[in-house]
Amino acid sequence: MGKVIGIDLGTTNSCVAVMEGGEPVVIPNSEGSRTTPSMVGFTDSGERLVGQIAKRQAITNPENTVFAAKRLIGRKFDSPEGKKAIGVSPFKVASSPNGDAWVEIRGKGYSPPEVSAIVLMKMKQTAEDYLGEQVSEAVITVPAYFNDSQRQATKDAGRIAGLSVLRIINEPTAAALAYGLDKVQDGGTERIAVYDLGGGTFDISILELNAGVFEVKSTNGDTFLGGEDFDQRLIDYLAKRFAESNNGLDLRKDRMALQRLKEAAERAKHELSSAPETEVNLPFITADASGPKHLTETVDRATFEALVTDLIDRTIEPCRIALKDAGIPAQQINQVLLVGGMTRMPRVQQKVKEFFGREPHKGINPDEVVAVGAAIQGGVLKGEVKDVLLLDVTPLSLGVETAGGVFTKIIDKNTTIPCKKSQVFSTAVDNQPLVSVHVLQGEREMAADNKTLARFELVGIPPAPRGVPQIEVSFDIDANGIVHVSAKDLGTGKVQQVRVVSNSGLSEAEIQAMISDAQSHASDDKKKKELAELRNNADGLIYTTEKSLEEYASLLSEKDREEIKADLERLKEVLNTSDAAVLKESFQRLEGSAYRIADAIYTGQAS
């Protein structure tokens, strides 16, 4: 039975873990880091760079390096979030044929699930390198406040990456699972608040832990609030300060300068979590008619905190709503877990302490705990982890549009999932052949203000006076938080044909095309890696052979010397070829002839 990996697919960084010997293990990537930047760089040669290597080349290739794709996943191009991304991204954000927000690289459109799949493939490869076996199953985490479209898009990303996604699990729930695994046998009930402020999203979940049962009581959040926004405030501040001393020159209009600013802002933000001030020093950041320009600015913690006060304050209202929905006052919370890199900021920790009236728990790694929880859930699903039951909730209400454009809720938010509820529909006019159902998700009173999931037409209704046909529509939310709808004619007992016209997301044909594309790129990447390794080995062989030939030429016959030199020159000629077979053949020839040097040395020593 193959291993199930747990993946935290983050906005800024991703992490992968696996259960080994009953314990979760975070897997370091090929660079030795336990987290991987969620960045993808597209090079001129068509190569796709992922993680740290993509981040390193972003400054010189900003318009072809995609970051924070998770913020676009499941979103419309003309949504407020889509428009905001356009304003701050050095890469191009474009509209797909169905209006979704995609990124455009060198004239080709890539869906956010497709970009996320490239990151997931890197995490899959990281796990396979560590385990020494193929991995095909995963548990992937999402922000608790993700809607159906965003969850489905994340599942699609997993499929494109060649993974069977066994479960989509909420990030705060995963963190609670990681925190509470060693407390499964303890008696009593523990109430936990998970405050999760990551790179792109904010979640708050209230849970109760009791004898291995992890029950989510409520969840709330903001899917467009996170470290990226904190970075942006610092970018804007530095750009403004630079403009003030350089005749209004706006660095944000220069894509390369913007990327350097972004990296500097991120670094300064990290440093200000442990130091009272930091210096941002960017020489030759741009130039004008008067010559090159340099940016040097000292930023102290108080200045940074003032820039982001409103962002931190925005996290408090969801906390208040979550406690109210759970029916638990703040003083009854036993533990507050801090999750996500932004919770390292002292002002964030102080705000959490002020609101909950207690010191938050800092005994977990905020960057790794979510992946650890996902791995544990994988262990639960495979039967490796016993005596653990996870009861999560749907973050948003599910309902339909009724007369007058009103949103009628059928499944309320914070209902434990999986769950199923039904509603009976009928016809409004005589002999009506179909009933249209508009399914939505959200909390607003009017249908137009909520998120459309799909429109269903229940067709083939037998002719009858209005109000007579009884069509039962069942709404089913699975354990992944993904919505399924079925319909049944109560009069005939027949299941009605349901035509689903989803207004967003990828079609099955698009997903299959992306799977093929990903597989082809994976094959290309493997060939490139093998060629690079072969080239490195050949380069090493050339060096050692030349050195040995120079040192031990006198031990060789003239014929052997000439043959080795000929093979050496041949390998040098083909060293930069892209034909692996030609390079391998020349490598093996020189390897064989160079063996004569070792043979001659051995014979010489023996005599």
Swiss-Prot record:
PROSITE patterns: HSP70_1, HSP70_2, HSP70_3. HAMAP family: DnaK. Induction: By stress conditions e.g. heat shock. This is Chaperone protein DnaK. The modification Phosphothreonine is found at T201. Belongs to the heat shock protein 70 family. Potential chaperone for other proteins involved in social motility. Keywords: ATP-binding, Chaperone, Nucleotide-binding, Phosphoprotein, Stress response. GO terms for molecular function: ATP binding; ATP-dependent protein folding chaperone; unfolded protein binding.
